Every structure is written in structure tokens, then in C-alpha cells.
Amino acid sequence: MGRYAREPDNAGKSCKARGSNLRVHFKNTCETANAIRKMPLKRAVAYLKNVTAQKECVPFRRFNGGVGRCAQAKQFGTTQGRWPKKSAEFLLQLLRNAESNADYSGLDVDRLVVQHIQVNRAACLRRRTYRAHGRINPYMSSPCHIELWLTEAESVPEAAKKPGKKTSAVEKSKKATAATH
């Protein structure tokens, strides 16, 4: 059992999970972890499934150099976002592990919230790529360590119901012109 960066305030109402030296990009995983922090467990699992299906994006706030813009990032108040599938799958595995730990400990799975999630850099793995004129360049990978714990909350906020589709001014004018013809 490894040491966690910090311990939960109420250890009896918490469950942990961690992964070490995971072969998944550190920067993508860091942004994905930041997106699910403080989310209820059920919402976090649904969100990560939506990321793999490209229905919701992960907002890139810190490691956003060269990241393209996407419309789905507007719901997070930013413009840049991506769909890091491998990071989402690794985090989904860890959440499922923590959920089974909670079930084993006798916690209420429906009231769990992602209280703490942290991604650290692991030791880089070194390979080489061969270039023109006999040169060799490094071909590095950036694995990471992930740790998280879920805490049983007093009450989990229900997902806000999405309001009906709003019609824009352009759509209203199209309907008005169609009605006159």
C-alpha cells in the first residue's frame, strides 16, 4: 500500500484507489482529472463515458498550447477542449475500482463524490527514433501516477434538468417567413 498525498478527513466514510506508472499521457490525464474533481460518482462515470463517445469534451485550461477550439467547451466557460479517450478509460477504471472498494466497505455508492484526485508525473520511458544522416532522437513517453478518494456526501445534488431547446432569432424569422408564404 502506497502513501497518498493527503488523507481524507473522515476515513470511515471514504474509499481510495490509485494507479502507478500508468502508460497514459500525463497532461491529458491531468486535465481530465481536473474536470471530474468534486463531481458525484455517477455523474463522473457518465461524463467519462461521454468523453470516450465524444459527446462531452474535456476543457483544457493549463496544458492548452496548440489545442483546438470546440463548441462543447463553452459549458465549462472556456474555448479549448479535447476528447482524451485513453485518459478517460484509465480514470473510469480507477473510479470503478474505488466504487467496488466503497461497496466492500459498506458505503452508500449513490452518495459518493470525487473528493480528491491527483495526477503526478512518473519516470519517463526512453525509446529512440532514427533520423536522417545517422542521427538519433529521443522518443519519450510521459506516464503518470493517479490517486483518488471518494467520500460519502450528506446529499448529492441531482443533475439539473436541461431546459427545452431555445429557438434563436434566426430560427424565429425563418418560421415567420415560412408562415407568410
Swiss-Prot record:
GO terms for cellular component: cytosolic large ribosomal subunit. Residues 157-181 are annotated as: Disordered. One of its GO terms (biological process) is cytoplasmic translation. Keywords: Ribonucleoprotein, Ribosomal protein. Transmembrane segments: none annotated. InterPro entries: Ribosomal_uL22, Ribosomal_uL22_CS, Ribosomal_uL22_euk/arc, Ribosomal_uL22_sf. NCBIfam families: uL22_arch_euk. PANTHER family: 60S RIBOSOMAL PROTEIN L17. This is Large ribosomal subunit protein uL22.
